[in-house]
Amino acid sequence: MLFRSDLDLEPALTTYYQKHLTDGTFVSWLAVDGERIIGTSGMSFVEKPPYYSNPTGKIGLLSSMYTHPDYRRQGIARKLLDCVVEEARACGCGAVWITASEMGVLLYTAYGFEKNGRFLQYVL
């Protein structure tokens, strides 16, 4: 089983976001149309030992990427990705990683992400 539909993640997610948005280890963006949220993106920061293609060892893990169906194919996801990449660079990350849905793979590869094992990777 890939997921449990009976599991209530809201309390754990609330705790996670309160902690990590406050301490700066998670950042998030919203795309809005008036007062309506039409897109989201988030990124966690992790550190691995430095290596040749990423001498800082810092990686941005992209998550929570979503665009409302009524607003797709209007460049919103690309603008959110621009925010992610800009923030990752500013924080000294050497790469941004994501595990993507089939629909998302097209967006990410068009943006410049490349397959790296189980992840798609954008080298900064």
Show which residues each predicted segment covers.
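Conserved beta-strand-loop-alpha-helix junction that forms the acyl-donor binding cleft
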Residues: V96-L106, Q121-L124
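Conserved acetyl-CoA-binding loop of GNAT-fold acetyltransferases
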Residues: C93, T109-F119
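Conserved acetyl-CoA pyrophosphate-binding loop and the N-cap/start of the following alpha-helix
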Residues: Y71, G75-C83
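Conserved acetyl-CoA binding element of GNAT-fold acetyltransferases
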Residues: S53-P69, R118-Q121
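Conserved GNAT acetyl-CoA-binding A-motif
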Residues: L81, A88-A100
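Conserved beta-strand in the GNAT
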Residues: L30, R36-F45, L61, Y66
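Active-site rim helix/loop that mediates acceptor-substrate recognition in acyltransferases
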Residues: D6-L30, G42, P49
